[in-house]
């Protein structure tokens, strides 16, 4: 059985971590490479970098950051934010990313997913879906940092991009993000059941039980969290031990 992955996420702007990382052993809590090194040593299964400004002006900074991180870390690295074309994917893979995540660009033109998957393989193409509840059992995709409604049904879109060659879905509940109230489990379950590819649950983790629920109730293949790890409330090792004690197969740190 495949192991469930635990994935810390770093929000990066202009080459700096913006939701600070409060590790006592870091020389510079704002340096993504320092944070990545700490997570690598702690046994994280993967790391996600999201370039939240995502402008082409700072793309060179992001390429440099990916290269410096890949040189120092062994865990797979997913990079997203402002990825619009297969040329962007190629440049990030050459810089050292293992996977590249599309978000708004895939919503605007889903053919970009197929084009990238055909060129580089589905295994390195992630589609990030930011969804909000619009009615019981119905979720809509929002883009541009959650500011722009699309009217697109999240489950239908997930099925569409999976059929076009996406290798993985990074699913964030915008209703839960930052609330520490736990994942949106009905949303996570609906998409996990609808697609034949792995789903990473994101948005709302406040306790280790929430990580467990994302898998046991949400059906996720991986769980992503930020603040519970960044601020030192829990370690990756504690999270893995808790999930293992709940019967979830993990790669022990």
Curated annotation (Swiss-Prot):
Subcellular location: Cytoplasm
Catalyses which reaction(s): 5-[(5-phospho-1-deoxy-D-ribulos-1-ylimino)methylamino]-1-(5-phospho-beta-D-ribosyl)imidazole-4-carboxamide + L-glutamine = D-erythro-1-(imidazol-4-yl)glycerol 3-phosphate + 5-amino-1-(5-phospho-beta-D-ribosyl)imidazole-4-carboxamide + L-glutamate + H(+)
Gene3D superfamilies, per the entry: Aldolase class I (3.20.20.70)
GO CC, one annotated term: cytoplasm
Keywords: Amino-acid biosynthesis, Cytoplasm, Histidine biosynthesis, Lyase
GO function terms (MF aspect): imidazoleglycerol-phosphate synthase activity; lyase activity
Enzyme Commission number, as recorded: 4.3.2.10
Enzyme class at the top of the EC tree: lyase
GO BP annotations, alphabetical order: L-histidine biosynthetic process
Active site: residue positions: 11, 130
Pathway(s) served: Amino-acid biosynthesis; L-histidine biosynthesis; L-histidine from 5-phospho-alpha-D-ribose 1-diphosphate: step 5/9
Major location (coarse): cytoplasm
InterPro entries with a match to the protein in the record: Aldolase_TIM, His_biosynth, HisF, IGPS_HisA/HisF, RibuloseP-bd_barrel
HAMAP family the UniProt entry points to: HisF (MF_01013)
Family: Belongs to the HisA/HisF family.
Function (record text): IGPS catalyzes the conversion of PRFAR and glutamine to IGP, AICAR and glutamate. The HisF subunit catalyzes the cyclization activity that produces IGP and AICAR from PRFAR using the ammonia provided by the HisH subunit.
SUBUNIT field: Heterodimer of HisH and HisF.
Protein name stated in the entry: Imidazole glycerol phosphate synthase subunit HisF
Organism of derivation: Cereibacter sphaeroides (strain ATCC 17029 / ATH 2.4.9)
Gene: hisF
